[in-house]
Amino acid sequence: MASNKHFDKSRSNLSNNSDIQEPGRPPAGHSVKFAQRTSSGRYINYSRDDLDSELGGQDFMSYTVHIPPTPDNQPMDPSISQKVEEQYVANSMFTGGFKSNTRAHLMHKVIETEPNHPQMAGSKGSSCAIPGCDAKVMSDERGQDLLPCECDFKICRDCFIDAVKTGGGICPGCKEPYKNTHLTDQVDENGQQRPMLPGGGGSKMERRLSMVKSTNKSALMRSQTGDFDHNRWLFETTGTYGYGNAFWTKDGDFGSGKDGDGDGDGMGMEAQDLMSRPWRPLTRKLKIPAGVISPYRLLIFIRIVVLALFLTWRVKHQNPDAVWLWGMSVVCELWFALSWLLDQLPKLCPINRATDLQVLKEKFETPTASNPTGKSDLPGFDVFVSTADPEKEPPLVTANTILSILAAEYPVEKLSCYVSDDGGALLTFEAMAEAASFANIWVPFCRKHAIEPRNPDSYFSLKRDPYKNKVKSDFVKDRRRVKREFDEFKVRVNSLPDSIRRRSDAYHAREEIKAMKMQRQNRDDEPMEPVKIPKATWMADGTHWPGTWLTSASDHAKGDHAGIIQVMLKPPSDEPLHGVSEGFLDLTDVDIRLPLLVYVSREKRPGYDHNKKAGAMNALVRASAIMSNGPFILNLDCDHYIYNSEALREGMCFMMDRGGDRLCYVQFPQRFEGIDPSDRYANHNTVFFDVNMRALDGLMGPVYVGTGCLFRRIALYGFNPPRSKDFSPSCWSCCFPRSKKKNIPEENRALRMSDYDDEEMNLSLVPKKFGNSTFLIDSIPVAEFQGRPLADHPAVKNGRPPGALTIPRELLDASTVAEAIAVISCWYEDKTEWGSRIGWIYGSVTEDVVTGYRMHNRGWKSVYCVTKRDAFRGTAPINLTDRLHQVLRWATGSVEIFFSRNNALLASSKMKILQRIAYLNVGIYPFTSIFLIVYCFLPALSLFSGQFIVQTLNVTFLVYLLIISITLCLLALLEIKWSGISLEEWWRNEQFWLIGGTSAHLAAVLQGLLKVVAGVEISFTLTSKSGGDDIDDEFADLYMVKWTSLMIPPITIIMVNLIAIAVGFSRTIYSVVPQWSKLIGGVFFSFWVLAHLYPFAKGLMGRRGRTPTIVYVWSGLVAITISLLWVAINPPAGNTEIGGNFSFP
């Protein structure tokens, strides 16, 4: 019979097989194993499972022995045991998944270099000097050893307790009695102790919430509309609760402790101070001047009227000489008018917004009676960074993005960063570890000298004076040192692929030698067989990498590997930790703490649909909810970094302002670096980000564009916004009354926080929606409460009391990370609503647009945050082929949306009509390519046939054409005026609209139809990101010509129109009765087409000056020859000769 002693919150939990129940797992009942791996990757432990496997059919029974407290066995202070356990958890790699145990592998070494920050995984620590004990000496927040004796004898926590209890309090080193035998006092003497949560006597989940569980009482507390009653979800305390929707005492003595009801923290005085202060908003809405917006709206109305009259005239006046030409042109013009209307109507209400960061600081970080140190009351922030392939997304780019996040101006203890590696590559893992190591130097340097931007690669590449406005005398010295360290950091990261390959080859050779020796020992005289050992990928500590190997093998391939979670930087302490002057930099007055950094690679197994980026994002949502549970989430692509260190605070101004609880997300504009100065292919996309998105901000808000978006976690969970009704009155309700009960499509139904009121609802429906993780389910109301605005004004509804978020965050323990492993498993989403109604929505290559649409469809609003200094910057493909494939993916997603239930025509009544039109245009715009291609060929057909779309160029046609053109130009000028874009940017957008419309959009329509009709699945390759190492030619990709079938339609249009111009010109010259009006009309429209396709033609030429002159000569000769041939074959009527006596041979 085997038995294991189980001590709560002790190191024996980490060294033995601890029976930690995982609520998020299937009924199989896996356990979390803390074990040491050998160099070959085998785990050494003696759990019941291992004994069963080794001893075969013998029956074993395990039980847990709880030893009662005795003089020799006293329970340890929970704060100390939690702190030590967090230290072990932060230095362990957790793996697990489908049909496998969750294991924590203690990482003695994460990277080849030595970590130099106490928060980093694998940081160096001294070992216990007691013979036979290999435990680590307890350390403080600075990583310094805590030694209880003046002789500096190194002893671990367990051995120190044994020496005090059984050794008479004698130091094993100097044999002198300890002056202090209390472990808590030893910690207090050497470092600061973390304050505990209120009511620390309860368990972790009991400390999270104080919930009224009576179903009868909850029925009374529920509002008449069925809205969630926010008074029930409050943090534990002995007094009454805050201001806003919570209860206040009538005499206003909350927190005064006069009658024993308050807790004496002075929060009542703070609330009175809030009421007495003049209320200041965090954001302001800046309307467009009436002198600009009024003429703009008037011109839209005039153009609509003129278009209607013009199309009516076109339909009534046919061209009997070319009815086919007239018919095609009229159909195309009707569609263009509809497309323009769908694009223009949502632009009727553009607005601008501004934030006030000073007010944010005053409200959330100003010292008060209850918060004398001015500890931040801002909510937590979880930042998601996604990467999938280190070959196409260079690790150095991702590492720079991580460094910009870690250095952001936001309370360190409130900020967490999660890196999703969907490829499970060791290269990405070690690059993130290198970034965490370099952050020890980079982040304090940024804080000390107020560096902008805080991406080191971008900062050291700035083409301006780096010493401008820097007042500290040691800045030059510090910058030089940091620059040297960054150069070494880049060398280490760029050499990681070769380092990992050499390391793996060396270990593989060693394993082969071992196997050959074993073979010789087992087979003395028998012939030797070739030794075949799978070529594994090895980590720096000499063990197998649990993710994807360089040479794919079973359980170690891109689509088949275990889930991995590694805490790269453990959670920081709650109090500032200042540096010292003796180090690399003088950091005496600089906070050297770093935010929580977690590496996550979700489990992938064959037979499970992983849903690409959307699935990776949902895995991060669940894992982060368990580990940090920040009520707000910012998602960034790996090549988009924080350019403005205050960007997070600016976004938080909107969420924390009055009415901010109804905002589902704050979208920031995308800004790009590395674009050619002329922006040949409209990569900046300023018309969309500065015109369309500002206009949507005046409605229900901008669409979600995939990156640079700050989410409210509770909105991602599929809940309705606060104070929402099932149906809002529409413009047709007066004429067609809506029935009281209506069936709503399943994907349009939203969860309500009132669904949690009934305990039976929790037990039955909630796991079916979110999965069977109780940790995840219990975190939902916590995120809802923490995400509320501050109740500092009577008009603020659904507010939270001040100071509620100044409590320290909970420490990480093994069960928490084990639960996070469970929720990123491949099977977790089975039979749940993840991806269908919760989180990022599956089923489209543009999951971002669909996810934002679902939120707006539930009644949520979003805002557009344009900061004075760009919030984020990224890279964009400047190569023509890559740009076309990017546009193809976007357009294909739009076609999928149009043929799905996410079509805006099926939107709920909660969505405004203009917002619905905007989403409808998102699904319709690729279909314009069909009519656009036809219309681009019409000028050529007109020149070839000698006819035109109208019978004659009369005054009516020309007047209509002139008015339509003038109104279009005036609208463009006014858009430029209120949006701030340039005329060149507007023209580049027009050019690429035609380039993309005649190439990528047409292919997207065909692919979308194939998927809908034939069920052909669509797959796209990942867009390659530039590593930024090509300093010789920054725009080398711009001139690279890579052939793709998407180029065929534009090339054909260019060639046909050029030939048609030559043919029409030749025919008119040699005609007896030249028809110059038809020639001018055809040539004008052909030049209109060619002018739009000029950037495309320029891209085909490659680098300037590389196209041989003979190519242009032969092109001209071929065009002239074809023109003469056409005239010879089809000469003008009544004349069989060309140019008099000259005849074509």
Swiss-Prot record:
Task: Give the main localization category.
Answer: Golgi
EC numbers for this chain? 2.4.1.-
Q: Alphabetically, which GO biological process terms does the record hold?
A: cell wall organization; cellulose biosynthetic process; response to cold; root hair elongation
Q: What membrane topology does the annotation report for this chain?
A: Multi-pass membrane protein
Q: Which UniProt keywords apply?
A: Cell wall biogenesis/degradation, Glycosyltransferase, Golgi apparatus, Membrane, Transferase, Transmembrane, Transmembrane helix
The record's GO molecular-function terms, alphabetically, read:
cellulose synthase (UDP-forming) activity; mannan synthase activity
Question: What residues form the membrane-spanning segments?
Answer: 291-311, 322-342, 930-950, 956-976, 1002-1022, 1046-1066, 1079-1099, 1109-1129
Q: Where in the cell is it found?
A: Golgi apparatus membrane
Which residues does the entry assign to the active site, renumbered to this chain? D422, D848
By sequence similarity, the record places it as follows: Belongs to the glycosyltransferase 2 family. Plant cellulose synthase-like D subfamily.
Q: Its function?
A: Thought to be a Golgi-localized beta-glycan synthase that polymerize the backbones of noncellulosic polysaccharides (hemicelluloses) of plant cell wall.
Supply the name of the protein. Answer: Cellulose synthase-like protein D2
Which species is listed as the source? Answer: Arabidopsis thaliana
Q: Which gene encodes it?
A: CSLD2
